A protein has these predicted regions:
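Short hydrophobic/Thr-rich beta-strand motif most characteristic of the beta2 strand and flanking loop
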Residues: 26-34, 41
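Short, Lys/Arg-enriched segments at the junction into DNA-binding effector domains
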Residues: 3-4, 114-169, 173
Protein backbone atom coordinates (compact mmCIF):
# COMPACT_ATOMS: atom_id res chain seq x y z
CA UNK A 1 0.00 0.00 0.00
CA UNK A 2 1.29 3.46 -0.91
CA UNK A 3 2.40 5.65 1.97
CA UNK A 4 0.03 8.51 2.73
CA UNK A 5 1.61 11.96 3.10
CA UNK A 6 -0.18 14.89 4.76
CA UNK A 7 1.05 18.22 3.35
CA UNK A 8 0.32 21.27 5.50
CA UNK A 9 1.11 24.58 3.79
CA UNK A 10 -0.92 27.74 3.23
CA UNK A 11 0.87 28.33 -0.09
CA UNK A 12 -1.65 26.54 -2.30
CA UNK A 13 0.56 26.56 -5.39
CA UNK A 14 3.50 25.08 -3.48
CA UNK A 15 1.31 22.44 -1.84
CA UNK A 16 -0.04 21.48 -5.27
CA UNK A 17 3.50 21.18 -6.65
CA UNK A 18 4.53 19.01 -3.70
CA UNK A 19 1.50 16.81 -4.26
CA UNK A 20 2.37 16.31 -7.94
CA UNK A 21 5.98 15.45 -7.12
CA UNK A 22 5.09 12.96 -4.39
CA UNK A 23 2.28 11.32 -6.34
CA UNK A 24 4.70 10.81 -9.25
CA UNK A 25 6.80 8.78 -6.79
CA UNK A 26 3.86 6.57 -5.86
CA UNK A 27 2.71 8.28 -2.66
CA UNK A 28 -0.85 9.33 -1.89
CA UNK A 29 -1.16 12.95 -0.79
CA UNK A 30 -3.65 15.06 1.15
CA UNK A 31 -3.05 18.82 1.37
CA UNK A 32 -4.52 21.26 3.90
CA UNK A 33 -3.88 24.97 4.43
CA UNK A 34 -3.94 25.57 8.19
CA UNK A 35 -3.10 24.01 11.53
CA UNK A 36 -6.66 23.26 12.63
CA UNK A 37 -7.42 21.31 9.46
CA UNK A 38 -4.07 19.56 9.77
CA UNK A 39 -4.97 18.20 13.20
CA UNK A 40 -8.43 17.17 12.03
CA UNK A 41 -7.03 15.43 8.94
CA UNK A 42 -4.38 13.68 10.99
CA UNK A 43 -6.98 12.20 13.33
CA UNK A 44 -9.24 11.21 10.41
CA UNK A 45 -6.74 9.61 8.03
CA UNK A 46 -3.65 8.72 10.15
CA UNK A 47 -1.01 9.64 7.54
CA UNK A 48 2.36 7.89 7.40
CA UNK A 49 4.30 11.18 7.31
CA UNK A 50 3.53 14.88 7.77
CA UNK A 51 5.17 17.65 5.73
CA UNK A 52 4.56 20.71 7.87
CA UNK A 53 5.15 24.38 7.08
CA UNK A 54 6.02 26.34 10.21
CA UNK A 55 4.29 29.58 9.18
CA UNK A 56 0.58 28.79 9.21
CA UNK A 57 -2.54 30.86 9.90
CA UNK A 58 -4.22 30.13 13.22
CA UNK A 59 -2.40 27.32 14.99
CA UNK A 60 1.19 27.62 13.79
CA UNK A 61 3.35 24.75 12.62
CA UNK A 62 5.37 24.49 15.82
CA UNK A 63 2.24 24.06 17.92
CA UNK A 64 0.84 21.53 15.43
CA UNK A 65 4.11 19.62 15.67
CA UNK A 66 4.01 19.69 19.46
CA UNK A 67 0.43 18.38 19.56
CA UNK A 68 1.12 15.61 17.06
CA UNK A 69 4.19 14.47 18.93
CA UNK A 70 2.25 14.19 22.20
CA UNK A 71 0.13 11.44 20.73
CA UNK A 72 2.08 9.93 17.85
CA UNK A 73 5.55 9.02 16.62
CA UNK A 74 4.62 9.77 13.00
CA UNK A 75 7.59 11.19 11.05
CA UNK A 76 7.33 14.99 10.80
CA UNK A 77 9.37 16.94 8.25
CA UNK A 78 9.26 20.73 8.51
CA UNK A 79 9.17 23.10 5.55
CA UNK A 80 10.87 26.36 6.46
CA UNK A 81 12.51 29.46 5.00
CA UNK A 82 16.28 29.05 4.87
CA UNK A 83 16.90 32.03 7.14
CA UNK A 84 14.55 30.91 9.93
CA UNK A 85 17.29 29.59 12.22
CA UNK A 86 15.33 30.08 15.45
CA UNK A 87 12.23 28.49 13.95
CA UNK A 88 14.19 25.44 12.79
CA UNK A 89 15.52 24.82 16.29
CA UNK A 90 12.08 25.44 17.83
CA UNK A 91 10.50 22.99 15.41
CA UNK A 92 13.07 20.30 16.13
CA UNK A 93 12.64 20.80 19.85
CA UNK A 94 8.86 20.51 19.39
CA UNK A 95 9.37 17.06 17.92
CA UNK A 96 10.07 17.35 14.19
CA UNK A 97 12.42 14.70 12.80
CA UNK A 98 13.87 16.67 9.91
CA UNK A 99 13.46 19.83 7.87
CA UNK A 100 13.64 20.95 4.25
CA UNK A 101 14.63 24.60 3.66
CA UNK A 102 12.77 26.57 1.01
CA UNK A 103 13.32 26.82 -1.87
CA UNK A 104 14.05 23.15 -2.46
CA UNK A 105 14.53 20.88 -5.44
CA UNK A 106 11.88 18.18 -5.93
CA UNK A 107 14.44 15.37 -5.73
CA UNK A 108 15.70 16.76 -2.41
CA UNK A 109 12.19 16.68 -0.96
CA UNK A 110 11.60 13.14 -2.21
CA UNK A 111 14.91 12.01 -0.69
CA UNK A 112 13.95 13.45 2.70
CA UNK A 113 10.54 11.76 2.62
CA UNK A 114 11.94 8.39 1.56
CA UNK A 115 14.65 8.58 4.22
CA UNK A 116 12.06 9.03 6.95
CA UNK A 117 9.81 6.30 5.54
CA UNK A 118 12.58 3.78 4.92
CA UNK A 119 11.55 0.27 5.86
CA UNK A 120 12.92 -1.68 8.79
CA UNK A 121 14.07 -5.26 8.59
CA UNK A 122 11.64 -6.89 10.97
CA UNK A 123 12.94 -10.42 10.30
CA UNK A 124 16.42 -9.99 11.76
CA UNK A 125 16.38 -10.38 15.53
CA UNK A 126 18.91 -8.24 17.33
CA UNK A 127 19.16 -7.39 21.00
CA UNK A 128 21.55 -4.80 22.40
CA UNK A 129 22.41 -3.91 25.97
CA UNK A 130 23.91 -0.72 27.28
CA UNK A 131 24.14 -0.43 31.04
CA UNK A 132 20.59 -0.76 32.33
CA UNK A 133 19.04 -0.46 28.88
CA UNK A 134 17.82 -3.47 26.91
CA UNK A 135 17.13 -2.78 23.22
CA UNK A 136 15.01 -5.04 21.01
CA UNK A 137 15.99 -3.77 17.56
CA UNK A 138 13.41 -5.69 15.49
CA UNK A 139 10.61 -4.84 17.91
CA UNK A 140 11.73 -1.21 18.32
CA UNK A 141 11.45 -1.50 22.10
CA UNK A 142 13.75 -0.02 24.76
CA UNK A 143 13.44 -1.14 28.37
CA UNK A 144 15.07 -0.29 31.67
CA UNK A 145 14.21 -3.14 34.00
CA UNK A 146 10.47 -3.61 33.66
CA UNK A 147 9.90 -0.10 32.33
CA UNK A 148 9.40 0.53 28.61
CA UNK A 149 10.88 3.81 27.39
CA UNK A 150 8.89 5.41 24.57
CA UNK A 151 11.09 6.74 21.76
CA UNK A 152 10.21 8.08 18.34
CA UNK A 153 11.55 5.97 15.44
CA UNK A 154 14.31 8.49 14.78
CA UNK A 155 15.37 8.65 18.44
CA UNK A 156 15.44 4.85 18.44
CA UNK A 157 17.60 4.74 15.30
CA UNK A 158 20.01 7.22 16.87
CA UNK A 159 20.34 5.13 20.03
CA UNK A 160 20.86 1.91 18.04
CA UNK A 161 23.52 3.50 15.82
CA UNK A 162 25.52 4.48 18.90
CA UNK A 163 25.00 1.17 20.70
CA UNK A 164 26.00 -0.97 17.71
CA UNK A 165 29.47 0.56 17.83
CA UNK A 166 30.28 1.01 21.53
CA UNK A 167 33.16 3.35 22.26
CA UNK A 168 33.32 4.55 18.65
CA UNK A 169 33.15 8.31 18.51
CA UNK A 170 30.74 9.43 15.79
CA UNK A 171 31.07 12.86 14.28
CA UNK A 172 27.81 14.71 13.82
CA UNK A 173 28.25 14.40 10.06
CA UNK A 174 28.57 10.61 10.37
CA UNK A 175 25.37 10.46 12.40
CA UNK A 176 23.55 12.63 9.86
CA UNK A 177 24.49 10.14 7.17
CA UNK A 178 23.89 7.00 9.23
CA UNK A 179 20.64 7.96 10.98
CA UNK A 180 19.04 10.54 8.68
CA UNK A 181 20.37 9.03 5.47
CA UNK A 182 22.12 12.10 4.08
CA UNK A 183 24.38 14.98 5.04
CA UNK A 184 23.21 18.53 5.66
CA UNK A 185 25.70 21.10 4.48
CA UNK A 186 27.39 22.53 7.59
CA UNK A 187 24.28 21.99 9.71
CA UNK A 188 24.47 19.75 12.76
CA UNK A 189 21.43 21.09 14.61
CA UNK A 190 19.43 17.99 13.73
CA UNK A 191 21.89 15.83 15.64
CA UNK A 192 22.29 18.16 18.60
CA UNK A 193 18.56 18.61 19.21
CA UNK A 194 17.77 14.92 18.82
CA UNK A 195 20.57 13.96 21.20
CA UNK A 196 19.01 16.32 23.75
CA UNK A 197 15.59 14.74 23.20
CA UNK A 198 17.02 11.23 23.47
CA UNK A 199 18.89 12.04 26.68
CA UNK A 200 15.75 13.47 28.26
CA UNK A 201 14.15 10.04 27.90
CA UNK A 202 16.94 7.54 28.56
CA UNK A 203 19.30 9.27 31.00
CA UNK A 204 18.59 9.20 34.72
CA UNK A 205 20.13 12.68 34.85
CA UNK A 206 20.20 14.33 31.39
CA UNK A 207 22.55 17.00 32.73
CA UNK A 208 25.10 14.28 33.55
CA UNK A 209 24.65 11.80 30.72
CA UNK A 210 26.07 8.29 31.02
CA UNK A 211 24.51 6.67 27.94
CA UNK A 212 25.05 9.24 25.17
CA UNK A 213 28.37 10.95 25.84
CA UNK A 214 29.59 14.16 24.21
CA UNK A 215 33.18 14.09 22.98
CA UNK A 216 34.02 17.76 22.75
CA UNK A 217 35.16 18.93 19.38
CA UNK A 218 34.26 15.62 17.75
CA UNK A 219 30.74 14.30 18.36
CA UNK A 220 29.06 11.58 20.42
CA UNK A 221 29.63 8.02 21.60
CA UNK A 222 27.82 5.41 23.65
CA UNK A 223 28.79 5.38 27.31
CA UNK A 224 28.66 2.61 29.88
CA UNK A 225 25.23 3.60 31.11
CA UNK A 226 26.31 2.88 34.64
Amino acid sequence: MAAHILVVDDDVALAEMIGIVLESEGFTVTAVEDGTRALDEFHTDAPDLVLLDLMLPGIDGIEVCRRLRRESDVPIVMLTARSDTADVVAGLEAGADDYVPKPFKPRELVARVKARLRGRDESAEEHLRLGELSIDVAGHVVRRGGETIALTPLEFDLLVALCRAPWKVFTREELLEKVWGYRHAADTRLVNVHVQRLRSKIERDPERPEIVITVRGVGYRAGTGS
